[in-house]
Amino acid sequence: MYLAELGGGTSLRAAVCSAVLDPRGPLFNDPREILEEELRRPGTYFSLLEELARGERRMESLTGALRVSHSALGPYLNELARMQLVEKRAPLTARRDMRYRLRDGFLRFWFRFVFPFQESLRAGAPLGDHYDAEIAPALADHVAPVFEGLCRRWALREMGGRVTRVGPWWGRSLDSLRATGERSGEEIDVVGSARSKVTLVGECKWTTGRMSPRALTDLEQFKLPALRQAGARFPAAGPEIALFSKSGFKDSLVDLAAGRDDIRLVDVDDVAAGLEVGQRHLEGRGVERQS
């Protein structure tokens, strides 16, 4: 629905400026009007959604930012979850260390780049300047979680029965590295499992530069050991590795992957083609899916 409002044949910058940032545009105030009709005390909800628009948050982070107690914030999160706007999820293979995230991509965009600036935009702030200063530098960071979700869906489609559950994982770094302060926490964008074993791990890069071997080194040297330390089980041969990149791969990484049977390099076109071909098949499999 929202994409249709942006229209075709124009640049993203021009479309966002006219449809979303312009106070006369169809999407400038649409989320506010809809949510104000649905929610009591919308101000508190809006503050919460603004915080979540910047990324997933633990409860402690939310209560600290909003200066409220767990018990006071809980009903607001529950109501947003009931409306399917917010969800709570744990790292795959674990049931603790829960995070909350804003599910709708446009609401994430609106509460991050429009809502905090509505007063100045109404006062006549130049739309192009706002886009260049606030949106363009953060756009890759904003889009990255969407790309990661698509990569997880791709994994379900392409890995067949070798992956029946997929999601992100986060947890503590190796105890030895935490003790020295070298590293504190690790995150893996794509973790796939089947029959209680981790069969796939993947890293996703939505950047303008090509992915380097450093991504693989970090995964194998730091992240996989941390995942094992957290109690994950692996097949005897270890998990397969998928590396996803918006901008392709450096030749050194291509050469490295060519010499190993357990590594697959996946670019944006591969992800798009896999999802387009497999969408109906995926929906009919009935597997558990986490994006």
Can you say where each PLM-predicted feature lies in the sequence?
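Short amphipathic alpha-helical interaction segments
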Residues: 67-82
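A cross-kingdom feature that marks ATP-driven nucleic-acid transaction machinery
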Residues: 92, 98, 103-291
